[in-house]
Design a protein with these regions (language model features):
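ATP-binding N-terminal substructure of ATP-dependent carboxylate-amine bond-forming enzymes
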Residues: 1-132, 136-138, 142, 149, ...
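Active-site nucleotide/adenylate-binding loops and adjacent lid/helix of ATP-dependent enzymes
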Residues: 3-7, 11, 15, 19, ...
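Hydrophobic beta-strand scaffold residues
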Residues: 35, 125-126, 154, 174, ...
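Glycine-rich phosphate/pyrophosphate-binding beta-alpha loops
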Residues: 107, 184, 239, 305-319
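Phosphate-binding site of ATP-dependent enzymes
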Residues: 191-272, 293-300
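Conserved metal-phosphate-binding beta-hairpin within the catalytic cores
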Residues: 214, 223-225, 278-310, 320
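Cysteine/selenocysteine-centered motifs that mediate thiol-based redox chemistry or coordinate metal-sulfur cofactors
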Residues: 330-339
Length: 339
């Protein structure tokens, strides 16, 4: 098949997306496909005729993930055409020539449904879920509201906008999150009123809406779901702090155990909850649900990831490997579900 792996963009998760794209590109090449790795924002300014037959080093632009989120203004300055269009030069043209686009994007303008909606209008096939469910899952406030409506256990919380902020914490400690952020960018644990107020001000740098929820002290887990079926539970134990941007993507920053060493009842309960969340949010193809478990063994579903990371340290590939699915086969399975 002719496959475009679409990565990059201008979200705070740009670097992660590029490394996901590189890994997926290599895996699909191994499977014998004609594959292009394309930055959705920077595009490709060369000759596009017979683009899939050209001998181009598509991964030359991809580097390692830094400990901090990327300088997006510097990325925007790299755009030679100066166009305000989100899609870089020839992106839509190249995607229309493909059999399917593998969505290796993360964060805003990737996981939020906007690109999916554009692709639907252009008749372009893509991996992952549809525009509506993508947009819902990108908004943590709406996701939590749906979890509550479907009886899915989730931490208590409130959400508010920059126009009407809640500057007095409802309860402490609490977690302050950018409503539409990802990779734990814009996430702070506040233990005091002063920390809370500082966190609210800082988090508004990442968007106009914030979610504040009760802090669940305990163990962190994740459960991938492929085509409605849960994978093994994985436990994530950061060596320092919580599972933030640095701990997620710097090798050696966390200890991950899959299958998680927890009672079978807890494993089955979390897997069932992940599948229920998948159905409640109307997800398609694949996703990953994040959980916390308190000292009493009660688990809470935090959020859904519609385009989980596929880097060397990412959780979904580790979960798939635990049931004998190689990274290459996982990528192929995701493609097969989309076509």
């Amino acid at each position: 098949m002719k496959i475009v792996v679409l990565a990059g963009g201008i979200s705070t998760e740009r670097d992660v997306s590029l490394v996901t794209g590189k890994n997926v590109y290599n895996a699909l090449c191994t499977k014998g496909h004609q594959v292009i790795l394309l930055d959705v924002y920077l595009g490709y300014e060369g000759e596009v005729q017979n683009i899939f037959e050209q001998d181009i080093d598509w991964i030359a632009q991809v580097g390692s993930i830094s400990e901090e989120s990327p300088d997006l203004e510097a990325v925007k300055a790299m755009r030679k055409d100066g166009d305000k269009n989100f899609f870089g030069p020839n992106v839509l043209t190249i995607c229309q020539e493909s059999d399917v686009v593998f969505m290796a994007l993360h964060g805003e303008c990737g996981e939020d449904g906007k690109i999916q909606a554009a692709f639907d209008l252009f008749g372009i096939r893509y991996t992952g879920t549809d525009p509506t469910s993508s947009a819902i899952c990108m908004d943590k406030a709406i996701t939590k509201d749906l979890f509550k409506a479907y009886g899915i256990s989730t931490p208590k919380g409130v959400h508010f906008t920059k126009e009407n902020p809640i500057m007095e914490p409802v309860a402490l400690p609490c977690v302050v999150k950018a409503c539409c952020g990802g990779s734990s960018v814009g996430v702070t644990i506040a233990n005091t009123k002063e920390e809370y107020q500082t966190a609210v001000k800082d988090t508004f740098r990442y968007g106009d809406k914030i979610v504040v929820e009760q802090y669940i002290k305990g163990r962190e887990f994740s459960v991938g779901v492929i085509d409605g079926r849960a994978l093994p539970v994985i436990e994530i134990a950061p060596l320092c702090g919580f599972y933030d941007y640095k701990n997620k993507y710097q090798a050696g920053s966390t200890v991950e155990t899959c299958p998680a060493e927890i009672p079978q009842e807890a494993t089955e309960g979390m897997q069932k909850c992940a599948e229920e969340a998948y159905r409640a949010l109307r997800l398609k193809n694949y996703a990953r649900m994040d959980f916390m478990m308190d000292a009493e063994g009660k688990y809470y579903c935090l959020e859904a990831n519609t385009l989980p990371g596929m880097t060397s340290t990412s959780l979904l590939p580790q979960e798939a490997a635990a049931v004998g699915i190689s990274f290459e086969d996982l990528c192929q399975k995701i493609v097969d579900m989309a076509v």
